[in-house]
Amino acid sequence: HDIRDHSDARTILSIRKLWVDMPGEIVRNVDLDVKEGEILGIGGLAGQGKLGIPNGVMGLYEAGGTVEFDGKPIALNSPRKCLDSQLAFVSEDRRGVGLLLDESLEWNVAFPAMQVQNKFLKRMGFFTWRDEKAIHTVTNRYIDELQIKCTGSGQKARELSGGNQQKVCLAKAFALEPRFLFVSEPTRGIDVGAKALVLEALKKFNRESGVTVVMISSELEELRQICDRIAIVSGGRGAGILPADHSS
């Protein structure tokens, strides 16, 4: 895969002395700089802190330290402020955090963007209502692009396979049109064909939209497939950064 050198790019996300209180994860003192436009992988053994980093930055678990995005400090412990700053997160917990299982694919894809950015809404005077046509269009665009196997955009998320549910989580994040995307264990529990598609979708999103991506995965081989650099986390701290081509 084509590994790009972003060493001259500016730092878009700067993490200093991050600690996170997340069950089963140690995050004690993480320093990390992410370059604009790159795909940075975060790898390491289970429980060593890699999952704690995005969950802490995005405010899902109590965290401390300092995080700056695009030169401005980001308030920790506030998911909404992160979303307002154009950061998005595809969680490893797709059934707990990721999906509204009893809602349609349309509602899953469009709801966060409606809630956070007032997208897909029509207004007249004091009245606001959903722009059903825009919601239908955006959902079908991602069903098509991500090859989500479903009976249609009105199908409930619960009825999809794990791989297709994961693609809906990606579509939901893509619909926010973020500048920065954390994606955690994106291929966990899905079949090989769906894995390749998910990785390709992330790479395409990064290349075409210029979105900076940080991907957390236990699969080093997977990180090597799409990342430009790989940060290894051990014992709750950064243990070094490797170029993706010789991270063996």
Question: What residues fall within each predicted segment?
Answer:
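Conserved P-loop NTPase catalytic core
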Residues: P54-G64, E68-L160, G240-S248
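Hydrophobic anchor residue at the start of the ABC signature
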Residues: L170
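Conserved beta-strand
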Residues: I15-L18, I26-E36, G65
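Catalytic Walker B motif of ABC-type/P-loop ATPase nucleotide-binding domains
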Residues: L181-E185
